[in-house]
């Protein structure tokens, strides 16, 4: 519920609705081939030198950014925002179909040379179990100052090695008296930004308003991503 408001956008419709909701998607799942090999994201819009991309189990054709259905996209300042789906009703079942659709959508997406995809996953490690991360260039882990978050950060390093992805860390809500402890709990050589504890960030997020604050660490992070 927070990402679109933090970006100053409207809430996008769930992409799951493109397939008739969870019910329609599950029907397609049952009718689809049980196993299909994909190459993942085709960078630069080309698969030259690679085996031909196989047809998706769920999409009629491969998509580029220009093929994204506009009714499921919010856009501002050149940034497109999409949402796969959420649990909206009590007792509707697990979120597994959302994980499947996320992976299939990413595998079906062709990228131009200037295109960049950022996937905001749920907190925790479940997306690794679903294989969502397998074609990512890098993984950014936001680490909060909590025991659970610091312990999980070590697990992300392990998963990154298993899926062949580089893992970097963003320390969040950093205060001077806990900074060293947070750095000691992660692979400090891969810390690319330290976001300070700022009351105005908390209050803006609490009210669901757009985050338009100027932070040097965010600029540093953006520059790191640009060069990566």
Predicted regions, residues:
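N-terminal phosphate/diphosphate-binding loop that engages ATP/GTP or pyrophosphate donors
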Residues: 1-77
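Short, glycine/acidic-enriched capping/hinge loops at junctions between secondary-structure elements
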Residues: 4-7, 93-95, 205
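Structural signal for conserved beta-strand scaffold positions within catalytic alpha/beta enzyme cores
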Residues: 17, 81-83, 141, 193-196
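Short, small-residue-enriched loops and turns at beta-alpha junctions
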Residues: 22-25, 34, 89-90, 125, ...
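Phosphate-binding/switch loop-helix module in NTP-utilizing enzymes
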Residues: 45-125
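Conserved catalytic-core segment of NTP-binding enzymes
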Residues: 96-194, 200-203
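C-terminal boundary of histidine-terminating zinc-finger modules
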Residues: 205-215
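C-terminal alpha-helix
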Residues: 217-228
């Amino acid at each position: 519920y927070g990402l679109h408001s933090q970006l100053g956008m409207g809430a996008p419709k769930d992409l799951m609705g493109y397939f008739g909701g969870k019910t329609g998607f599950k029907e397609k799942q049952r009718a689809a081939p049980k196993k299909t090999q994909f190459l993942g994201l085709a960078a630069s819009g080309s698969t030259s030198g690679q085996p031909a991309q196989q047809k998706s189990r769920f999409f009629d054709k491969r998509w580029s950014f220009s093929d994204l259905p506009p009714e499921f996209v919010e856009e501002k300042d050149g940034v497109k925002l999409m949402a796969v789906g959420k649990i909206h009703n009590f007792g509707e079942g697990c979120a597994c179909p959302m994980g499947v659709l996320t992976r299939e959508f990413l595998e079906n997406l062709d990228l131009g040379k200037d295109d960049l995809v950022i996937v905001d996953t749920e907190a925790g490690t479940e997306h690794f179990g679903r294989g969502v991360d397998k074609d990512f260039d890098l993984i950014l882990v936001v680490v909060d100052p909590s025991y659970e978050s610091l312990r999980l950060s070590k697990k992300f390093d392990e998963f990154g090695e298993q899926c062949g992805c580089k893992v970097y860390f963003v320390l969040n809500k950093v205060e001077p008296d806990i900074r060293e402890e947070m750095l000691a709990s992660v692979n400090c050589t891969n810390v690319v930004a330290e976001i300070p504890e700022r009351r105005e960030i908390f209050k803006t997020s609490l009210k669901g308003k757009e985050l338009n604050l100027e932070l040097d660490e965010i600029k540093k992070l953006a520059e790191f991503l640009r060069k990566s």
